[in-house]
Protein backbone atom coordinates (compact mmCIF):
# COMPACT_ATOMS: atom_id res chain seq x y z
CA UNK A 1 0.00 0.00 0.00
CA UNK A 2 1.59 3.27 -1.14
CA UNK A 3 1.49 6.25 1.21
CA UNK A 4 1.86 9.95 0.47
CA UNK A 5 2.29 12.70 3.04
CA UNK A 6 2.24 16.46 2.60
CA UNK A 7 2.73 19.40 4.93
CA UNK A 8 1.64 22.93 4.07
CA UNK A 9 2.61 26.03 6.00
CA UNK A 10 0.80 29.32 5.44
CA UNK A 11 1.77 32.77 6.61
CA UNK A 12 -0.14 36.01 6.26
CA UNK A 13 -0.17 39.33 8.05
CA UNK A 14 -2.78 38.10 10.55
CA UNK A 15 -1.62 34.61 11.50
CA UNK A 16 0.48 31.57 10.70
CA UNK A 17 -1.15 28.17 10.16
CA UNK A 18 -0.34 24.68 8.96
CA UNK A 19 -2.10 21.75 7.29
CA UNK A 20 -0.91 18.16 7.06
CA UNK A 21 -2.35 15.21 5.14
CA UNK A 22 -1.73 11.48 4.83
CA UNK A 23 -3.02 9.51 1.83
CA UNK A 24 -3.02 5.74 1.28
CA UNK A 25 -3.69 4.06 -2.06
CA UNK A 26 -5.69 0.84 -1.78
CA UNK A 27 -6.10 -0.30 -5.37
CA UNK A 28 -8.11 2.38 -7.19
CA UNK A 29 -9.39 3.80 -3.88
CA UNK A 30 -7.54 6.51 -1.96
CA UNK A 31 -7.89 7.00 1.81
CA UNK A 32 -6.94 10.42 3.15
CA UNK A 33 -6.69 12.11 6.55
CA UNK A 34 -6.23 15.88 6.81
CA UNK A 35 -5.21 17.77 9.94
CA UNK A 36 -4.68 21.44 10.76
CA UNK A 37 -2.25 22.84 13.30
CA UNK A 38 -5.17 23.04 15.76
CA UNK A 39 -5.38 19.23 15.67
CA UNK A 40 -1.99 18.80 17.34
CA UNK A 41 -1.08 22.04 19.12
CA UNK A 42 -3.78 21.84 21.78
CA UNK A 43 -3.95 18.15 22.22
CA UNK A 44 -4.02 16.07 20.22
CA UNK A 45 -7.69 16.90 19.57
CA UNK A 46 -10.24 16.27 16.82
CA UNK A 47 -10.27 19.97 15.87
CA UNK A 48 -9.51 20.37 12.18
CA UNK A 49 -9.53 16.62 11.46
CA UNK A 50 -11.18 15.37 8.25
CA UNK A 51 -11.29 11.85 6.80
CA UNK A 52 -11.98 11.08 3.14
CA UNK A 53 -12.48 8.16 0.76
CA UNK A 54 -11.79 8.94 -2.89
CA UNK A 55 -11.91 7.20 -6.23
CA UNK A 56 -10.15 9.65 -8.58
CA UNK A 57 -12.42 10.85 -11.36
CA UNK A 58 -15.47 9.20 -9.79
CA UNK A 59 -16.32 10.27 -6.22
CA UNK A 60 -15.09 11.76 -2.93
CA UNK A 61 -16.78 11.27 0.44
CA UNK A 62 -15.33 13.50 3.17
CA UNK A 63 -16.22 13.46 6.87
CA UNK A 64 -15.43 16.47 9.08
CA UNK A 65 -14.93 14.84 12.48
CA UNK A 66 -15.51 17.78 14.88
CA UNK A 67 -18.47 19.15 12.89
CA UNK A 68 -19.90 15.67 12.20
CA UNK A 69 -20.55 16.83 8.66
CA UNK A 70 -20.44 14.71 5.50
CA UNK A 71 -19.59 16.16 2.10
CA UNK A 72 -20.28 14.19 -1.08
CA UNK A 73 -18.70 14.87 -4.46
CA UNK A 74 -19.45 12.87 -7.60
CA UNK A 75 -17.75 13.32 -10.97
CA UNK A 76 -18.69 12.04 -14.42
CA UNK A 77 -17.91 12.77 -18.06
CA UNK A 78 -20.36 12.64 -20.95
CA UNK A 79 -19.87 13.61 -24.58
CA UNK A 80 -21.83 16.29 -26.44
CA UNK A 81 -21.17 16.50 -30.19
CA UNK A 82 -18.01 14.45 -29.55
CA UNK A 83 -16.83 17.04 -26.99
CA UNK A 84 -16.21 15.95 -23.37
CA UNK A 85 -18.47 17.55 -20.76
CA UNK A 86 -17.09 17.10 -17.24
CA UNK A 87 -19.79 17.21 -14.56
CA UNK A 88 -19.32 17.55 -10.79
CA UNK A 89 -22.03 17.29 -8.12
CA UNK A 90 -21.19 18.49 -4.59
CA UNK A 91 -23.48 18.24 -1.56
CA UNK A 92 -22.74 19.28 2.02
CA UNK A 93 -25.16 17.82 4.55
CA UNK A 94 -24.65 20.34 7.40
CA UNK A 95 -25.73 23.44 5.48
CA UNK A 96 -27.83 21.47 2.97
CA UNK A 97 -25.99 23.09 0.08
CA UNK A 98 -25.73 21.56 -3.38
CA UNK A 99 -23.44 22.78 -6.15
CA UNK A 100 -23.40 21.58 -9.75
CA UNK A 101 -20.36 22.33 -11.90
CA UNK A 102 -19.95 21.65 -15.61
CA UNK A 103 -16.99 22.11 -17.95
CA UNK A 104 -17.20 21.66 -21.72
CA UNK A 105 -13.84 21.18 -23.45
CA UNK A 106 -14.34 22.62 -26.93
CA UNK A 107 -10.75 21.98 -28.03
CA UNK A 108 -7.24 22.12 -26.62
CA UNK A 109 -7.39 25.93 -26.39
CA UNK A 110 -11.02 26.67 -25.49
CA UNK A 111 -13.17 25.62 -22.54
CA UNK A 112 -16.55 26.80 -21.24
CA UNK A 113 -17.49 26.27 -17.58
CA UNK A 114 -20.55 26.92 -15.42
CA UNK A 115 -21.04 26.73 -11.65
CA UNK A 116 -24.51 26.85 -10.03
CA UNK A 117 -25.71 26.60 -6.44
CA UNK A 118 -29.02 24.71 -6.54
CA UNK A 119 -31.99 26.63 -5.14
CA UNK A 120 -30.38 30.05 -5.59
CA UNK A 121 -29.63 32.44 -8.42
CA UNK A 122 -25.89 32.06 -7.79
CA UNK A 123 -24.42 31.07 -11.13
CA UNK A 124 -21.07 31.83 -12.74
CA UNK A 125 -20.08 31.25 -16.35
CA UNK A 126 -16.41 31.19 -17.29
CA UNK A 127 -14.60 31.00 -20.61
CA UNK A 128 -11.00 29.79 -20.66
CA UNK A 129 -8.64 30.42 -23.56
CA UNK A 130 -5.18 28.85 -23.51
CA UNK A 131 -2.66 30.34 -25.92
CA UNK A 132 0.24 28.11 -26.91
CA UNK A 133 -0.18 25.98 -23.79
CA UNK A 134 1.55 28.65 -21.67
CA UNK A 135 -0.70 31.72 -21.39
CA UNK A 136 -4.32 31.56 -20.20
CA UNK A 137 -7.09 34.17 -20.24
CA UNK A 138 -10.25 33.62 -18.14
CA UNK A 139 -13.19 36.05 -18.12
CA UNK A 140 -15.97 35.03 -15.70
CA UNK A 141 -19.51 36.42 -15.51
CA UNK A 142 -21.48 36.32 -12.24
CA UNK A 143 -25.19 36.22 -13.08
CA UNK A 144 -26.31 36.99 -9.51
CA UNK A 145 -24.14 40.10 -9.15
CA UNK A 146 -24.17 41.04 -12.86
CA UNK A 147 -20.41 41.58 -12.71
CA UNK A 148 -17.28 40.32 -14.44
CA UNK A 149 -14.08 38.85 -13.02
CA UNK A 150 -10.89 38.45 -15.05
CA UNK A 151 -7.80 36.28 -14.68
CA UNK A 152 -4.62 36.09 -16.76
CA UNK A 153 -1.87 33.57 -16.11
CA UNK A 154 1.49 32.68 -17.63
CA UNK A 155 3.33 29.41 -17.13
CA UNK A 156 7.09 29.19 -17.63
CA UNK A 157 9.23 26.20 -18.59
CA UNK A 158 11.02 26.52 -15.24
CA UNK A 159 7.80 25.41 -13.55
CA UNK A 160 6.92 28.89 -12.31
CA UNK A 161 3.42 30.23 -12.81
CA UNK A 162 2.32 33.88 -12.55
CA UNK A 163 -1.37 34.78 -12.29
CA UNK A 164 -3.19 38.13 -12.08
CA UNK A 165 -6.86 38.52 -11.12
CA UNK A 166 -9.34 41.38 -10.91
CA UNK A 167 -12.84 41.31 -9.39
CA UNK A 168 -14.93 44.19 -10.70
CA UNK A 169 -17.59 43.88 -7.96
CA UNK A 170 -15.13 44.37 -5.08
CA UNK A 171 -12.37 46.13 -7.07
CA UNK A 172 -9.93 43.56 -5.70
CA UNK A 173 -6.68 43.21 -7.66
CA UNK A 174 -4.52 40.15 -7.01
CA UNK A 175 -1.15 38.76 -8.07
CA UNK A 176 0.13 35.22 -7.49
CA UNK A 177 3.47 33.53 -8.06
CA UNK A 178 3.72 29.77 -7.60
CA UNK A 179 5.95 26.81 -8.34
CA UNK A 180 5.18 23.11 -7.94
CA UNK A 181 7.20 19.95 -8.36
CA UNK A 182 7.04 16.43 -7.02
CA UNK A 183 8.91 17.16 -3.78
CA UNK A 184 7.82 20.68 -2.85
CA UNK A 185 6.12 23.87 -3.91
CA UNK A 186 5.36 27.41 -2.88
CA UNK A 187 2.86 30.17 -3.54
CA UNK A 188 3.15 33.90 -2.82
CA UNK A 189 0.05 36.07 -3.14
CA UNK A 190 -0.52 39.81 -2.95
CA UNK A 191 -3.87 41.57 -3.16
CA UNK A 192 -5.08 45.14 -2.84
CA UNK A 193 -8.57 46.60 -2.71
CA UNK A 194 -8.59 49.51 -5.14
CA UNK A 195 -11.75 50.85 -3.49
CA UNK A 196 -9.88 51.20 -0.20
CA UNK A 197 -8.61 54.72 0.40
CA UNK A 198 -5.36 53.44 1.92
CA UNK A 199 -4.93 50.65 -0.65
CA UNK A 200 -2.91 48.57 1.82
CA UNK A 201 -1.70 45.33 0.16
CA UNK A 202 -2.32 41.97 1.83
CA UNK A 203 0.44 39.39 1.52
CA UNK A 204 0.29 35.61 2.03
CA UNK A 205 2.87 32.88 1.50
CA UNK A 206 2.47 29.10 1.36
CA UNK A 207 5.07 26.34 1.31
CA UNK A 208 4.32 22.68 0.64
CA UNK A 209 6.52 19.61 1.21
CA UNK A 210 5.58 16.23 -0.27
CA UNK A 211 6.84 12.80 0.75
CA UNK A 212 6.08 9.52 -1.00
CA UNK A 213 6.76 6.12 0.57
From Swiss-Prot:
Function: High-conductance voltage-dependent solute channel with a slight selectivity for cations transporting triosephosphates, dicarboxylic acids, ATP, inorganic phosphate (Pi), sugars, and positively or negatively charged amino acids.
Keyword Transport: yes
Biological process per Gene Ontology, one example term: regulation of monoatomic ion transmembrane transport
One annotated Gene Ontology cellular component of this protein: pore complex
Membrane topology per record: Multi-pass membrane protein
Membrane spanning residue stretches: 4-13, 19-28, 33-42, 56-64, 71-80, 94-103, 109-118, 123-132, 145-156, 160-168, 171-179, 202-211
Protein name, UniProt field: Outer envelope pore protein 24B, chloroplastic
Organism: Arabidopsis thaliana
UniProt keywords, alphabetically: Chloroplast, Ion transport, Membrane, Plastid, Plastid outer membrane, Porin, Transmembrane, Transmembrane beta strand, Transport
GO molecular function term, any single one: porin activity
Family per similarity comment: Belongs to the plastid outer envelope porin OEP24 (TC 1.B.28) family.
Positions on the Cytoplasmic side per record topology: 1-3, 29-32, 65-70, 104-108, 133-144, 169-170, 212-213
Complexes and interactors: Homooligomers form large rather nonselective pores in plastidial outer membranes.
Chloroplast intermembrane topological domain residue ranges: 14-18, 43-55, 81-93, 119-122, 157-159, 180-201
